[in-house]
């Protein structure tokens, strides 16, 4: 399950125009827990359902265009990116457990997308809307402390030697502080 969620986060980063995942979004669900084939009709139906169109009055293509919805996304409920660590934390942990080199490549793409779009003259700032395709990225005057304390720590650790804060010897609390596991 953790692998699927992490791979889903990576996919979501790649699916967005800026290469950065939004804070809150809804996807079209597969009918079962098994992988499913792409179903454009199901996507359109879910987009309209999320928009509240029970009577069929809305044009689905117009909604998709106006809402800037990539395929599979039924809604982007919070388009901000506030420099959160959870996605890269998941990539880091899965990488340390599996050793999958593709996870480092994905982490590098995530890092570059974040740096390219959030960098300011002094630091990094949250983004108001990650769905913009017109180059009008709004970097807000906001940098939560978890950017430095957690997000950048996980980006650093995924490219460090695996014995640096090894998951065999340490666990992380919710604030990304490593604690030695008693032996």
Which role does the model predict for each range below?
Residues 1-183:
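Glycan-recognition and catalytic cores of secretory/periplasmic carbohydrate-active enzymes
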């Amino acid at each position: 399950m953790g692998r699927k969620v992490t791979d889903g986060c990576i996919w979501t980063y790649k699916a967005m125009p800026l290469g950065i995942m939004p804070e809150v979004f809804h996807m079209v669900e597969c009918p079962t827990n098994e992988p499913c084939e792409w179903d454009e009709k199901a996507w359109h139906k879910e987009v309209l359902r999320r928009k509240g169109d029970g009577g069929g009055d809305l044009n689905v293509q117009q909604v998709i265009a106006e809402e800037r919805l990539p395929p599979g996304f039924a809604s982007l409920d919070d388009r901000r990116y506030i420099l959160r660590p959870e996605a890269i934390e998941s990539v880091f942990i899965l990488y340390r457990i599996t050793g999958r080199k593709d996870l480092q490549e994905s982490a590098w793409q995530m890092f570059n997308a974040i740096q390219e779009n959030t960098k300011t003259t002094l630091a990094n700032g949250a983004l108001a809307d990650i769905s913009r395709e017109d180059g009008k990225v709004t970097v807000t005057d906001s940098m939560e402390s978890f950017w430095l304390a957690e997000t950048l720590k996980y980006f650093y650790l995924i490219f460090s030697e695996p014995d640096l804060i090894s998951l065999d010897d340490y666990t992380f609390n919710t604030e990304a502080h490593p604690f030695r596991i008693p032996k």
